Amino acid sequence: MTQFIGSIDQGTTSSRFIIFDRQGDIVASDQREHEQIYPKAGWVEHNPIEIWRNTQHVIAAALKKAKLKASDIASVGITNQRETTLLWDRKTGAPLYNAIVWMDTRTDELVSRYTKDGGADQLRAKTGLPISTYFSGLKLRWILDNVPGAREKAEAGDALFGTIDTWLVWNLTGGTEGGIHITDVTNASRTQLMDLSTLQWDEDILRLFDIPSACLPEIRSSSEVYGEITLPSLSGVKLAGILGDQQAALFGQACLEPGEAKNTYGTGCFMLMNTGEKLVPSNYGLLTTVAYKLDGAKPVYALEGSIAITGALVQWLRDNLGIIRNSSDIETLARTVEDNGDVYFVPAFSGLFAPHWQDSARGIIAGLTRFANKGHIARAALEASAYQVREVLDAMVKDSGVEITELRADGGMTINELLMQFQSDILDVPVVRPKIIETTALGAAYAAGLAVGYWKSTKDIVENWQVGHRWHPRMSAEESTRLFNAWEKAVQRSLGWIE
């Protein structure tokens, strides 16, 4: 009797394979980091071959830890870092260039050209997205324009475009020997090439961006049997779920009703609110996106606030400044001071995402005096995540007209008690961490399990969700308002830094 579901979680810094049981509990997992490549300022790349090699490794290692074989796995789902873009040779399987990562800003000149001609919001009605360096379409355009032979191969159908999910699916299902070239609606919605209403590639946008349709994958639902895995360790297992990482976390957090919201604290922060089958356009700097689409059902949409730098700021303090040895030391250092000492850190390393969408912003530390020490800087770095989330939540309430009664939180930074309490204080709502914090991988597992009947319905997902910890607001409204207003002043100082 098959008892388990596998989930490939391919993130910005590492690849993991996690095996779940019917209750959504983790049976075994394995993780392997990959190199972050920085060829120039603002450029961030990954080696797709390294990611594929690491994926194979973690699958085999997790199965070995659990003492399981392929026949014990009912199906496998994939969740992935979104927007990260690559183009590879259909015949050889070799990437034509490294994967260009979601936070990479090399397309800023293209963005400037298009926004000058038609404004940043000219594609919002169709795609839900502003023209930005963030999304895949212009990253693909950059590859086509700058990699010798790429455009010719793409136009001939000899080069395949994909986000990371597409690359993994193609390799898992045979690669050059019959690999399936697909993506799901959630990942497609982040390319800025798909119409949110039709869930198809939009010919007008393809013409505008000068992208040949011959290189694009087929768009499928988030939960259906796509094919069988050919990898020896999972040979014959059905590949049955794909969700972009933030949509997967929404699904794994059981935010399945309109108005329910989650926030993932990782390299960046990503808050999504379920808006049901209704497409809600944003007037306050948020993104409209596809939350998920189950096989045969109507799509469910979401509002999203994307924040580029949160956990990455802690890594920067560790790697670039050396004021902490391990990322986990940040809370201890921040607790050496009673408050932020009126120091504010705006981590606009690659501009500001939601709700500002200012590519020209750059990071600043404001409010420094001789009194400030590294404890204040550590605390300001943590608080920066919470302030940015407050900005997004305020915009979400304005767009949706729905007051959020609690925020479901997940991701690596939720183990930081100081941050979670401050987040509850600055939002003035409870923050809830679930019992299982690996909600991104769990969401992909749920999508894959539903497709093969392992879980009968989304009701099973709701019943599996359990509270791990709940933080309640303890700060006065006057104090939280004072702190947030000072943060907003610091943000204004960061804007327009790049001419």
UniProtKB/Swiss-Prot annotation:
Family matches, as PROSITE patterns: FGGY_KINASES_1, FGGY_KINASES_2
InterPro entries the record matches: ATPase_NBD, Carb_kinase_FGGY, Carb_kinase_FGGY_CS, FGGY_C, FGGY_N, Glycerol_kin
Entry binding sites for glycerol: R82, E83, Y134, D245, Q246
Catalytic activity: glycerol + ATP = sn-glycerol 3-phosphate + ADP + H(+)
Any one of the GO BP annotations: glycerol catabolic process
Positions of ATP binding: T12, T13, S14, T267, G311, Q315, G412
Keyword check for Kinase: yes
Residues binding ADP: T12, R16, T267, G311, G412, N416
Binding-site residues for sn-glycerol 3-phosphate, renumbered to this chain: T12, R82, E83, Y134, D245
GO molecular function: ATP binding; glycerol kinase activity
Disulfides per UniProt: none
Top-tier EC class: transferase
Reported regulation of activity: Inhibited by fructose 1,6-bisphosphate (FBP).
Superkingdom of source: Bacteria
Alphabetical UniProt keywords: ATP-binding, Glycerol metabolism, Kinase, Nucleotide-binding, Transferase
GO cellular component assignments: cytosol
EC number: 2.7.1.30
Nucleotide-binding in keyword set: yes
Pathway: Polyol metabolism; glycerol degradation via glycerol kinase pathway; sn-glycerol 3-phosphate from glycerol: step 1/1
Family classification: Belongs to the FGGY kinase family.
Function statement: Key enzyme in the regulation of glycerol uptake and metabolism. Catalyzes the phosphorylation of glycerol to yield sn-glycerol 3-phosphate.
HAMAP family listed in its UniProt record: Glycerol_kin
Protein name as it appears in the record: Glycerol kinase
Organism: Brucella anthropi (strain ATCC 49188 / DSM 6882 / CCUG 24695 / JCM 21032 / LMG 3331 / NBRC 15819 / NCTC 12168 / Alc 37) (Ochrobactrum anthropi)
Gene that encodes it: glpK
